[in-house]
Amino acid sequence: MEAAAQFFVESPDVVYGPEAIEAQYEYRTTRVSREGGVLKVHPTSTRFTFRTARQVPRLGVMLVGWGGNNGSTLTAAVLANRLRLSWPTRSGRKEANYYGSLTQAGTVSLGLDAEGQEVFVPFSALLPMVAPNDLVFDGWDISSLNLAEAMRRAKVLDWGLQEQLWPHMEALRPRPSVYIPEFIAANQSARADNLIPGSRAQQLEQIRRDIRDFRSSAGLDKIIVLWTANTERFCEVIPGLNDTAENLLRTIELGLEVSPSTLFAVASILEGCAFLNGSPQNTLVPGALELAWQRRVFVGGDDFKSGQTKVKSVLVDFLIGSGLKTMSIVSYNHLGNNDGENLSAPLQFRSKEVSKSNVVDDMVQSNPVLYAPGEEPDHCVVIKYVPYVGDSKRALDEYTSELMLGGTNTLVLHNTCEDSLLAAPIMLDLALLTELCQRVSFCTDADPEPQTFHPVLSLLSFLFKAPLVPPGSPVVNALFRQRSCIENILRACLGLPPQNHMLLEHKMERPGPVLKRVGPVAAACPVLNKKGPVPAATNGCTGDANGHLQVEEPQMPTT
């Protein structure tokens, strides 16, 4: 069925007001206790009231590393869609779109229609969201190239599209940025010709002035700052240096060690702007997280989950979820863009290695039948710099799992990842979902005081390799669970139950009046779509899914 563009929830629990959508929602879950070696499961229920402001703001996005491959590609994508550009390629004419974006190209199921078929709507139709074509961009970069020159240097887009975008991007030029050589690879020094001078405190203040200038000059209601610059080395967390907000601000004032990304995070938080870290380093040190908590500003991270790691978070979930004991994961990458060149330095590679290696931890820990405490698969990650392949990253993976009775299963996967074309829609989703979360508040019957989401916005985990979560919260890396979290929280804002995929009405021997089937048997009730009748069976056969014809459903006796 085609995705509908608009819908309304008809329920006494949902009110569409002129300023907000208010919904009553029953959150049902379970709590588990242990008594004498026995697990006791206690169903619980909490009544929430969600309020989502309907007024969509004028939103600006500031990219740190605006002139890099990701920043120039995202800017080009929004311009190409806004201008409705098309261009010739060797395989035919292409048109601008937002493929790869969860919010713009993904759909969600609302339920079943009168024919028993699922009805889907675009993800962006669930709640009022900023239209991506309305985004306003600005940002910083250590390279002074304008965005048109940066686009040409990146070599990501077809030449015909670059030619059309050139006059629109030529006037866009990054603001000077912070360059601290010891945090990134030495090979980046050749690009560093557009720098903020002065002490760390002066650099922090300049970043804050840039944010304020962008807000006023572009007439913006909100700004979201997103780090898409180079991977930095890890910053050691030291008591008295960056362990608290007070100590971190003092460290900046005294000119002690602080990474450029942490400077941008602190500046963003102080200006009330959400900050999202798209690289693997530990930008959001404890002091930055405490500052975000004090200022009630959203932060999220770490490291865009775009290619190889996204596949891994699906495949390992499938293997372990199927009862196969994955024992070895070997991941090899080679790429030729500037990210690859920067990662050729050992300290920067170590940051990436950590974020790519932790992605399977929660899946392993979820199955104590397969894995003893402390047991985990061997996991090796290799990244090599090969300039010729440019932005077209190659990812090769080998997964070896144990089967029953001593058998083994090996999966080998080759994945060509267009690095920036995969990352750009993720950046788009991060900005749109973060802004939406800023308009959502809720309360419970037990705590009627309205509140918002925790400043560490773990709802964004679907989009990050190493997702940050509030202290004490479980880290979820399995992709299906991460997507379900976003979808079900947005459904809760409309008073809708979580999507559980049970389809129980199709599995009952004797449906009641509410769950009544459309016809007596699947074969006798073909589903209609715009192309005409099609068999209900999934393999194209009329009858059961294994190809055998169905018999008439017998009448069951009633008591």
From Swiss-Prot:
Belongs to the myo-inositol 1-phosphate synthase family. Keywords: Cytoplasm, Inositol biosynthesis, Isomerase, Lipid biosynthesis, Lipid metabolism, NAD, Phospholipid biosynthesis, Phospholipid metabolism, Phosphoprotein. NAD(+) binds at residues 67-70, 141, 177-178, 188, 191, 228-231, 278-279, 303, 306, 337-339, 352, 390-391, 419-420. It is an enzyme of class 5 (isomerase). It holds the Pfam family Inos-1-P_synth. It is found in: Cytoplasm. This is Inositol-3-phosphate synthase 1. One of its GO terms (molecular function) is inositol-3-phosphate synthase activity. One of its GO terms (biological process) is phospholipid biosynthetic process. Pathway: Polyol metabolism; myo-inositol biosynthesis; myo-inositol from D-glucose 6-phosphate: step 1/2. GO terms for cellular component: cytoplasm. Its cofactor is NAD(+). Its main location: cytoplasm. It comes from Macaca fascicularis. Key enzyme in myo-inositol biosynthesis pathway that catalyzes the conversion of glucose 6-phosphate to 1-myo-inositol 1-phosphate in a NAD-dependent manner. Rate-limiting enzyme in the synthesis of all inositol-containing compounds. The modification Phosphoserine is found at S279, S357. It catalyses: D-glucose 6-phosphate = 1D-myo-inositol 3-phosphate. It comes from the Eukaryota. SUPFAM superfamilies: Glyceraldehyde-3-phosphate dehydrogenase-like, C-terminal domain, NAD(P)-binding Rossmann-fold domains. InterPro entries: Myo-inos-1-P_Synthase, Myo-inos-1-P_Synthase_GAPDH, NAD(P)-bd_dom_sf.
